[in-house]
């Protein structure tokens, strides 16, 4: 995903797990091997080595994974295989539009990091629950959020 800040293009690298939760977000000025390494190292340090890694067909991912010696876990084959990652950009885009864009790379990085955590907390996937269970889960999430903010 890219974002323009003062006419310059910046890229948001996002890692999403199999359930659609945002694991990590990194903002860079380029889409190259160095940027891919930055994201992958953060993920490996925090979550360990995954079973498979699904990406788009950007060559930077393959180069970074070869350097980290995890290229055997890389999966780019299959139609629509990375839809979960692509769809994770939509809530961020909506907030970006509401905030009338970003003006600094630093504020974009802070926002992307925080937005992923907050979205994961409140994203209840209401199509999986009955209305009553959804309301209970949402109320519990809101109570937990208020407790965190009260500290």
For the regions a protein language model found, what residue spans apply to each?
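RNase H-like two-metal-ion nuclease catalytic core shared by retroviral integrases
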Residues: 77-94, 106-109
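Active-site proximal helix-loop segment of RNase H-like, two-metal nucleases, encompassing DDE(D)
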Residues: 88-104, 115, 120-122
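Acidic/histidine-rich, metal-coordinating catalytic segments
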Residues: 50-61, 79
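Mobile genetic element proteins and their domesticated derivatives, centered on retroelements
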Residues: 15, 20, 40, 53-56, ...
């Amino acid at each position: 995903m890219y974002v323009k800040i003062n006419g310059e293009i910046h890229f948001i690298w996002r890692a999403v797990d199999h359930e659609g939760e945002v694991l990590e977000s990194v903002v860079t000025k380029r889409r190259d091997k160095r940027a891919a390494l930055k994201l992958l190292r953060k993920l490996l340090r925090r979550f360990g080595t995954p079973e498979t890694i699904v990406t788009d067909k950007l060559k930077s991912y393959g180069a970074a994974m070869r350097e980290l010696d995890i290229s055997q876990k890389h999966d780019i084959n299959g139609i629509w295989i990375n839809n979960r990652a692509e769809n994770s950009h939509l809530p961020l885009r909506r907030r970006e539009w509401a905030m009338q864009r970003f003006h600094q790379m630093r504020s974009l990085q802070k926002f992307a990091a925080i937005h992923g955590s907050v979205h994961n907390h409140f994203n209840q996937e209401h199509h999986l629950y009955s209305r009553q269970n959804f309301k209970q889960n949402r109320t519990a999430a809101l109570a937990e959020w208020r407790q965190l903010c009260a500290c």
